[in-house]
C-alpha cells in the first residue's frame, strides 16, 4: 500500500505543479533568507571587530523575526494548496480511501515537496551568500577584516526551523482531513473563509500592541535605551501587523459592506466581495510583504546613514593625527601625564605640528525649570545635557577672544540641541551648591571642531566657559580629562613605525588611565567596521527584498487562479469587461499598496528610535533623515516596477 501511495504522491505533485510551483518558490525564498541571516550572524570575524558582537546579536534577533515571517508565509501558501486540492481529497474518500491513507498520502507528498524545496533553498542560499559576499567585497575595495566562510551550523539551524514548520503544516493538514467529510471537502474550494472569533477583540489587541510599540519608539530619549528596547518594539510591531491585517481587514471590509451606497456599486461590490472571500489568507500575505518591506527600508536607511557618517565621525573624534587623553577624578593625579606625553612625542619620525593641550571637566545635567542641574547626575543616568567645562583663559588663547567670567558665572556655548531650551536659563546647581549664572550664550561649534568628540551621547551638548573648571571636579558625578593632540609631517611609509614607537613608550609607564590614539589606525578599524556593516546591510536588504517580491508574485499567481472562475461567472451574468477590469485594478491596487503604505508608517515611527541608535556611532540625525528619504524614494520606484511586472501575470491568468 505504501508503494502505491508513494507513486500516487509523486504523480499528484506533477499533476498539481501549477499549485506547487508557487509554493516551492515561497519555500525556497524563506529558506534562502533564513540561511543568509543565520550565516551572517555566525560570521566568526565579528568577534574581533569593533561593534561586531552587537551586530551578531542584532542578526540573531533578525533570524527570529525571519522565522516568524517564514512560518506565516508557508502556512499561507499551504492553505492555498490545500483549499484547491480539497476536492481531490474528497474524491479519494468517496472512492474508498480511508482517512489514515489520505493522511499518509498527504505526508508523503509533503516530505517529498519539503525535501526538494528546502534542499534547493539551502543550495541557493549558500550560492547567494558566497557570490554576493565576493561581489560586495570586490566593490568595497579594501580589507574589512571579514572573509567568506561556509556555515554548517546555519544549515542545521535552517533545517531545524523548516522541519518544525512543515511538521506543523502536516498536523494542520491531517486535522483538516480527519475532521472533514468527503462531501465537505468536495465543496471546500468554493467556500469563503470564516471571519474567526472575537474580531473586534483581536483588532483592539492589535491596535494596543502597535500603539504601545509606537509610543515606546517616540517616548525614549536615551540612545542606549533606544538600543535596548528596539528589538522589543520590532517584535510588537510584527505581531501587531499580522493581527491588524487579519482582524483589522475583516472589520474594515465588514464596515464597507454595511455601507450599502458604497458596496452595491458594481466595481466596489466585486472587489470587496473578492477580498472578503479570502480575507485571512490575504492578510497573512499582505502582512508578510509589509514586514519584509519595512525591514528593507530600515536596514538600508541605517546602513547608508552609517556609511555617509563615517568620514564625519572620524574627523570629529580624531581631528589630529595623534591624541592622548588621560582621565582622572583627583586634581593631584593630573601632573603625571604631561611628561609621559612628551616622551611619546620624542619618538616622532618627522616634525611635530599643531601641538595643543586641553584640560576639561565633563559634567552631565538634568533639566530643571530654570536650566540644568549638575547634582546627583552621572553618565549612566541618560542625561538631558552634557557640558564640557573649560577655563576662560584656555578658551581665549585658543580662539583669540577676550571673554571674562566671575567665580560664579558661566558662558555657555551651544554645540548640539535646541537653543531655545536654554535661552532663558539663569542658574545652575553644582557640586558645592553654588548658583552659577549664565552670563552669555554663544556658538560652541568652533570649540567642537578642534576638540576631540567625547564617547558620550546626549541630545543637548554645550561647552561651559568658567573661571576654574577644576572646582567642578567630583569623584562621583564628574571627571577631568587631559587632552594632548598633535600632527606630524612624517612620510606615510614611516607612520606604522612611528605608531609602534609611540605605543612602546606608553607601555613603559603605568598609565592605565591614559589612552593613545592614531587617526590612521582608527580609520582602519572604523572602515573595517563600516565596510562589514555595508556588506551585512546590503546582503540582508537584497534577501528581504527578494522575499517581498516573491511573496507578492506568489499572491498574484495563486489569487489569479482563484479569481479566474469567478470572473468567468461574472461575464456570463452580463457584467461588461470594462467593469470587471476596473474592479480588478482596484483590488490589485489595494493588495499592492496597503503593505507599502503601512511599511512607510512603521518606518516613520521607527525613525526616532534608529536615529538615536545611529547617534551612538556619532552620525548626525540629518544624515539619517536624508538617507531614509532617499532609500524610501528608491524603494517606491522599485516597488512600482515589481507591481507592473507581477500584475501582468495576474491579468494573464484571469484572461485565460
Task: Give the predicted meaning of each segment.
Residues 3, 7, 179-193, 561-565, ...:
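Short cytosolic juxtamembrane segments of multi-pass membrane proteins
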Residues 314, 320-546:
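Basic-flanked hydrophobic alpha-helices used for secretion and membrane insertion
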Residues 17-45, 54-90, 110-124, 202, ...:
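Hydrophobic alpha-helical transmembrane segments of multi-pass inner-membrane transport and secretion
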Residues 109-256:
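Hydrophobic alpha-helical segments
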Residues 1-31, 195-200, 209, 244-293, ...:
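N-terminal Sec/SRP start-transfer signal
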Residues 2, 6, 10, 104, ...:
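Alpha-helical membrane-protein architecture signal
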Residues 39-53, 122-155, 211-228, 594-656:
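Short helix-loop junctions at transmembrane helix boundaries
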